[in-house]
Amino acid sequence: DVIRIFDALNDPRNLQTAIKSANKEGAHVQGCISYTLSPVHNNEYFAAYAKTLEEMGANSICIKDMAGLLTPYTCYDLVRKLKETVSIPVDIHSHYTAGLASMSILKGIEAGADIVDTAMSPLSLGTSHMPTESLVAALQGTDYDTGLDLKQLNVVRAYFAKLREKYIANGQISPKSLGVDANTLLYQVPGGMFSNMLKQLKDAGKEDKLDEVLAEIPRVREDAGYPPLVTPTSQIVGTQAVFNVIMGERYKMVTKEFK
Protein backbone atom coordinates (compact mmCIF):
# COMPACT_ATOMS: atom_id res chain seq x y z
CA ASP A 1 0.00 0.00 0.00
CA VAL A 2 1.18 3.52 -0.83
CA ILE A 3 0.45 6.03 1.92
CA ARG A 4 0.75 9.60 0.63
CA ILE A 5 1.66 11.89 3.52
CA PHE A 6 1.79 15.68 3.33
CA ASP A 7 1.67 18.75 5.50
CA ALA A 8 0.04 21.94 4.29
CA LEU A 9 2.90 24.02 5.70
CA ASN A 10 5.71 21.71 4.55
CA ASP A 11 6.67 21.35 8.21
CA PRO A 12 8.40 17.99 8.70
CA ARG A 13 7.58 18.01 12.42
CA ASN A 14 3.93 17.49 11.52
CA LEU A 15 4.80 14.34 9.55
CA GLN A 16 6.97 12.49 12.05
CA THR A 17 4.24 10.36 13.62
CA ALA A 18 2.52 9.52 10.32
CA ILE A 19 5.75 8.48 8.60
CA LYS A 20 6.91 6.44 11.58
CA SER A 21 3.56 4.66 11.88
CA ALA A 22 3.28 3.91 8.15
CA ASN A 23 6.82 2.55 8.08
CA LYS A 24 6.10 0.38 11.11
CA GLU A 25 3.12 -1.18 9.30
CA GLY A 26 5.22 -1.92 6.22
CA ALA A 27 3.54 0.60 3.91
CA HIS A 28 5.25 2.47 1.09
CA VAL A 29 5.57 6.00 2.47
CA GLN A 30 5.28 8.75 -0.12
CA GLY A 31 6.41 12.05 1.34
CA CYS A 32 4.85 15.06 -0.36
CA ILE A 33 6.07 18.50 -1.28
CA SER A 34 3.10 20.87 -1.12
CA TYR A 35 4.05 22.90 -4.20
CA THR A 36 3.30 26.60 -4.26
CA LEU A 37 4.60 29.92 -5.54
CA SER A 38 5.62 32.75 -3.24
CA PRO A 39 8.58 34.99 -2.38
CA VAL A 40 9.81 32.29 0.03
CA HIS A 41 9.31 29.13 -2.06
CA ASN A 42 11.70 27.99 -4.80
CA ASN A 43 13.10 24.75 -6.23
CA GLU A 44 16.10 24.79 -3.89
CA TYR A 45 13.72 24.98 -0.93
CA PHE A 46 11.68 22.05 -2.25
CA ALA A 47 14.77 19.92 -2.92
CA ALA A 48 16.04 20.49 0.62
CA TYR A 49 12.62 19.56 2.00
CA ALA A 50 12.56 16.39 -0.11
CA LYS A 51 15.93 15.37 1.34
CA THR A 52 14.53 15.85 4.83
CA LEU A 53 11.56 13.62 3.96
CA GLU A 54 13.89 10.92 2.64
CA GLU A 55 15.94 11.05 5.83
CA MET A 56 12.73 10.72 7.85
CA GLY A 57 11.89 7.46 6.10
CA ALA A 58 9.98 8.34 2.93
CA ASN A 59 10.17 5.69 0.20
CA SER A 60 9.31 8.11 -2.60
CA ILE A 61 8.70 11.83 -3.10
CA CYS A 62 5.55 13.36 -4.58
CA ILE A 63 5.46 16.86 -6.06
CA LYS A 64 1.93 17.71 -4.97
CA ASP A 65 0.95 20.49 -7.38
CA MET A 66 -2.60 20.84 -6.07
CA ALA A 67 -3.36 24.10 -7.88
CA GLY A 68 -1.74 23.23 -11.22
CA LEU A 69 0.83 26.01 -10.89
CA LEU A 70 3.84 24.00 -12.03
CA THR A 71 5.04 25.30 -15.39
CA PRO A 72 6.86 22.97 -17.83
CA TYR A 73 10.41 24.25 -17.51
CA THR A 74 10.12 24.81 -13.77
CA CYS A 75 8.92 21.22 -13.50
CA TYR A 76 11.91 20.01 -15.52
CA ASP A 77 14.30 21.92 -13.26
CA LEU A 78 12.57 20.77 -10.07
CA VAL A 79 12.58 17.10 -11.06
CA ARG A 80 16.26 17.31 -12.04
CA LYS A 81 17.10 18.88 -8.67
CA LEU A 82 15.12 16.24 -6.82
CA LYS A 83 16.79 13.39 -8.72
CA GLU A 84 20.17 14.90 -7.86
CA THR A 85 19.22 15.34 -4.20
CA VAL A 86 17.34 12.16 -3.25
CA SER A 87 17.88 8.50 -4.11
CA ILE A 88 14.19 7.51 -4.05
CA PRO A 89 11.55 7.70 -6.83
CA VAL A 90 9.90 11.01 -7.73
CA ASP A 91 6.18 11.30 -8.55
CA ILE A 92 4.45 14.28 -10.22
CA HIS A 93 0.89 15.03 -9.11
CA SER A 94 -0.30 18.07 -11.08
CA HIS A 95 -3.89 19.25 -11.48
CA TYR A 96 -5.12 20.59 -14.83
CA THR A 97 -6.80 23.71 -13.46
CA ALA A 98 -4.54 26.16 -15.30
CA GLY A 99 -4.07 23.96 -18.38
CA LEU A 100 -0.38 23.30 -17.74
CA ALA A 101 -0.33 19.72 -16.47
CA SER A 102 0.18 17.87 -19.77
CA MET A 103 3.15 20.03 -20.72
CA SER A 104 4.65 19.97 -17.24
CA ILE A 105 4.31 16.21 -16.85
CA LEU A 106 5.95 15.60 -20.24
CA LYS A 107 8.91 17.80 -19.28
CA GLY A 108 9.03 16.12 -15.89
CA ILE A 109 9.22 12.71 -17.55
CA GLU A 110 12.08 13.95 -19.72
CA ALA A 111 13.83 15.15 -16.55
CA GLY A 112 13.61 11.70 -14.99
CA ALA A 113 10.33 11.50 -13.08
CA ASP A 114 9.57 7.92 -12.09
CA ILE A 115 5.79 8.19 -11.62
CA VAL A 116 3.08 10.58 -12.84
CA ASP A 117 -0.55 10.84 -11.76
CA THR A 118 -3.29 10.90 -14.40
CA ALA A 119 -7.06 10.34 -14.63
CA MET A 120 -9.22 8.52 -17.15
CA SER A 121 -10.38 11.05 -19.75
CA PRO A 122 -14.06 11.36 -18.67
CA LEU A 123 -12.89 12.45 -15.22
CA SER A 124 -9.83 14.41 -16.34
CA LEU A 125 -8.95 18.06 -17.02
CA GLY A 126 -10.17 21.05 -15.03
CA THR A 127 -9.59 20.49 -11.33
CA SER A 128 -8.61 16.86 -12.04
CA HIS A 129 -5.52 15.56 -13.87
CA MET A 130 -4.36 15.10 -17.44
CA PRO A 131 -6.01 12.22 -19.36
CA THR A 132 -4.37 8.83 -18.93
CA GLU A 133 -5.08 7.80 -22.52
CA SER A 134 -3.49 10.96 -23.95
CA LEU A 135 -0.25 10.41 -22.09
CA VAL A 136 -0.14 6.74 -23.04
CA ALA A 137 -0.53 7.71 -26.71
CA ALA A 138 2.07 10.48 -26.46
CA LEU A 139 4.68 8.12 -25.04
CA GLN A 140 4.09 5.19 -27.40
CA GLY A 141 7.20 4.20 -29.34
CA THR A 142 9.51 6.24 -27.10
CA ASP A 143 11.91 5.31 -24.32
CA TYR A 144 9.08 6.19 -21.93
CA ASP A 145 6.46 3.87 -23.48
CA THR A 146 4.06 2.78 -20.72
CA GLY A 147 3.13 -0.51 -22.36
CA LEU A 148 -0.55 0.16 -21.66
CA ASP A 149 -3.12 -0.88 -24.29
CA LEU A 150 -5.29 1.99 -25.53
CA LYS A 151 -8.02 -0.44 -26.61
CA GLN A 152 -8.27 -1.82 -23.09
CA LEU A 153 -8.20 1.68 -21.64
CA ASN A 154 -11.14 2.56 -23.88
CA VAL A 155 -13.24 -0.03 -22.05
CA VAL A 156 -12.43 1.71 -18.78
CA ARG A 157 -13.12 5.09 -20.38
CA ALA A 158 -16.62 4.00 -21.43
CA TYR A 159 -17.45 3.00 -17.86
CA PHE A 160 -16.40 6.34 -16.41
CA ALA A 161 -18.08 8.30 -19.22
CA LYS A 162 -21.45 7.05 -17.97
CA LEU A 163 -20.58 7.97 -14.39
CA ARG A 164 -19.52 11.46 -15.47
CA GLU A 165 -22.91 12.12 -17.07
CA LYS A 166 -24.68 10.78 -13.99
CA TYR A 167 -22.71 13.01 -11.62
CA ILE A 168 -23.14 16.10 -13.79
CA ALA A 169 -26.89 15.47 -13.97
CA ASN A 170 -27.29 15.10 -10.19
CA GLY A 171 -25.05 18.07 -9.42
CA GLN A 172 -22.17 16.16 -7.83
CA ILE A 173 -19.85 17.44 -10.55
CA SER A 174 -20.02 21.14 -11.37
CA PRO A 175 -19.39 21.96 -15.06
CA LYS A 176 -17.33 24.93 -13.84
CA SER A 177 -14.79 22.53 -12.34
CA LEU A 178 -14.26 20.74 -15.67
CA GLY A 179 -12.81 23.63 -17.63
CA VAL A 180 -9.42 25.33 -17.68
CA ASP A 181 -9.11 28.60 -15.78
CA ALA A 182 -5.81 30.41 -16.34
CA ASN A 183 -6.77 32.77 -13.50
CA THR A 184 -5.46 30.00 -11.26
CA LEU A 185 -1.96 31.20 -12.11
CA LEU A 186 -2.84 34.43 -10.30
CA TYR A 187 -5.12 33.13 -7.53
CA GLN A 188 -3.43 29.75 -6.86
CA VAL A 189 -6.71 27.97 -6.13
CA PRO A 190 -6.39 24.14 -5.99
CA GLY A 191 -9.11 21.90 -7.36
CA GLY A 192 -10.63 20.80 -4.07
CA MET A 193 -10.65 24.36 -2.79
CA PHE A 194 -12.37 25.64 -5.93
CA SER A 195 -15.12 23.03 -5.70
CA ASN A 196 -15.65 23.77 -2.00
CA MET A 197 -15.77 27.50 -2.65
CA LEU A 198 -18.35 27.10 -5.41
CA LYS A 199 -20.56 25.17 -2.99
CA GLN A 200 -20.18 27.82 -0.27
CA LEU A 201 -21.17 30.59 -2.67
CA LYS A 202 -24.05 28.56 -4.09
CA ASP A 203 -25.40 27.81 -0.60
CA ALA A 204 -25.21 31.52 0.22
CA GLY A 205 -26.85 32.52 -3.07
CA LYS A 206 -23.72 34.48 -3.98
CA GLU A 207 -22.40 32.62 -7.02
CA ASP A 208 -22.04 35.97 -8.80
CA LYS A 209 -19.30 36.89 -6.30
CA LEU A 210 -16.89 34.19 -7.52
CA ASP A 211 -14.48 36.56 -9.28
CA GLU A 212 -14.33 38.84 -6.23
CA VAL A 213 -13.57 35.88 -3.97
CA LEU A 214 -10.84 34.63 -6.31
CA ALA A 215 -9.22 38.07 -6.25
CA GLU A 216 -9.42 38.14 -2.44
CA ILE A 217 -7.71 34.79 -1.92
CA PRO A 218 -4.11 35.91 -2.68
CA ARG A 219 -4.58 38.90 -0.37
CA VAL A 220 -5.73 36.69 2.49
CA ARG A 221 -2.90 34.23 1.75
CA GLU A 222 -0.33 37.03 1.94
CA ASP A 223 -1.82 38.20 5.23
CA ALA A 224 -1.40 34.65 6.55
CA GLY A 225 2.27 34.41 5.52
CA TYR A 226 2.04 32.62 2.15
CA PRO A 227 0.93 29.13 3.25
CA PRO A 228 0.61 26.57 0.43
CA LEU A 229 -3.08 26.26 -0.39
CA VAL A 230 -3.84 22.62 0.31
CA THR A 231 -5.99 20.88 2.94
CA PRO A 232 -6.57 22.32 5.50
CA THR A 233 -5.04 25.74 4.76
CA SER A 234 -6.88 26.02 1.43
CA GLN A 235 -10.24 25.70 3.16
CA ILE A 236 -9.20 28.09 5.94
CA VAL A 237 -7.95 30.77 3.55
CA GLY A 238 -10.79 30.18 1.07
CA THR A 239 -13.53 30.41 3.69
CA GLN A 240 -12.04 33.62 5.07
CA ALA A 241 -11.92 35.10 1.56
CA VAL A 242 -15.59 34.18 1.06
CA PHE A 243 -16.52 35.90 4.34
CA ASN A 244 -14.48 38.99 3.45
CA VAL A 245 -16.43 39.38 0.21
CA ILE A 246 -19.90 38.40 1.42
CA MET A 247 -19.70 40.59 4.55
CA GLY A 248 -18.62 43.59 2.48
CA GLU A 249 -15.72 44.31 4.82
CA ARG A 250 -12.41 42.49 5.18
CA TYR A 251 -12.12 40.51 8.42
CA LYS A 252 -15.44 41.78 9.78
CA MET A 253 -16.00 38.11 10.56
CA VAL A 254 -12.92 35.96 11.22
CA THR A 255 -13.17 32.19 11.46
CA LYS A 256 -11.75 30.39 14.48
CA GLU A 257 -9.50 28.36 12.19
CA PHE A 258 -8.01 31.47 10.57
CA LYS A 259 -7.27 33.01 13.99
Q: Where are the regions a protein language model picked out?
A:
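Catalytic cores and adjacent flexible loops of soluble metabolic enzymes
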Residues: 1-259
